Amino acid sequence: MNFKKVYILALLLLFKLGFAQEVLPVYSDYLSDNYYLLHPSMAGAANCAKLRITARQQWFDQSQAPALQTVSFNGRINDRSGAGVILINDRNGFHSQRGIRLSYAHHLKFDRDDVDLNQLSFGLSTGFAQSVIDETTFKQFDPSVNGGIQQKANYFNIDVGTSYNYFDFYLHFTIKNLLASERNLYTQKEATNLRRFILNTGYTFGDEKSFVWEPSIMFQNVSQTKESIVDFNLKVYKSLNDGAAKIWGGVSYRRSLDGAEYFEGNSIGSLSGGTISSQKLQYVTPILGLNYKNFMISYTYSQLVQQVKFDTAGFHQLTLGLNLFCKPERYHCNCPAVN
């Protein structure tokens, strides 16, 4: 039997499994005006309470393809404190996970006056999740598979983080899944270390009457696997109708700093007649959004761009948002995450 290409998908498999057991996978939804999804220190940091509903679907042409839905809400408790909640529903084939995260943030202000943004924030988030393996449709040909049941396990973990917003500059750092967590639902030898370090930084500049630009970077490091991933982002904002509406868009490029080797050739049983190549995970995500009064809608589409990939279809994501209990924009800065 001839095979045009034989692929070893180690990198992509590692990428998917690296996210599979976390309460909330790290995708590009934070770019839809929702840094709170990643950083509990951003709870209540803005002048409005923010409700965000996100649905992400991968590979529409595949049965039981990965899908994720989140509902998040965060807002101010008082001038120096904020709180939030995130609801999560994540599915991938016969595996699913539901969870809730509760957050509290404290904000320290170093403003010279009421219009200069200089704020340091600290946040804590507690998370509860239930993982499920649905074996009700499994055939009992393997004694190690129970079949006919749903296996369930509950997990608890915490995130801690800090944010610094200074005029048009921002910096966020969070340690996710700080505690060791046993995951005996799958095997007795699953790693208990789910710790992930996330760093975001960016800067906005431009003219509010014309265009405002926001370049940013996100860096991730996974403690257990030592894998590192970086996002390079660029967003642009344009106000319409005297500020009643704002259209914005941009692009994100994600790249793994770690690679994997694969064999490309005409035979599975022999390495002869082929070559060993390597590649790194990378995909591009364009994003388009619209704010009208207190409403927000955004759409993102992620497309893998490396040679080896599971499927040619991309990942679609839609976010709906509503800003509540808004106060007048306080700070003189191009800071859409705060003003």
Give the residues covered by each predicted segment.
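Positively charged n-region of N-terminal signal peptides that target proteins for export
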Residues: M1-V6, R112
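Sec-dependent N-terminal signal peptides
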Residues: K5-F15
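Sec/Tat signal peptide C-region and signal peptidase I cleavage site
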Residues: K16-A20
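Subset of outer-membrane beta-barrel
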Residues: Q21-N339
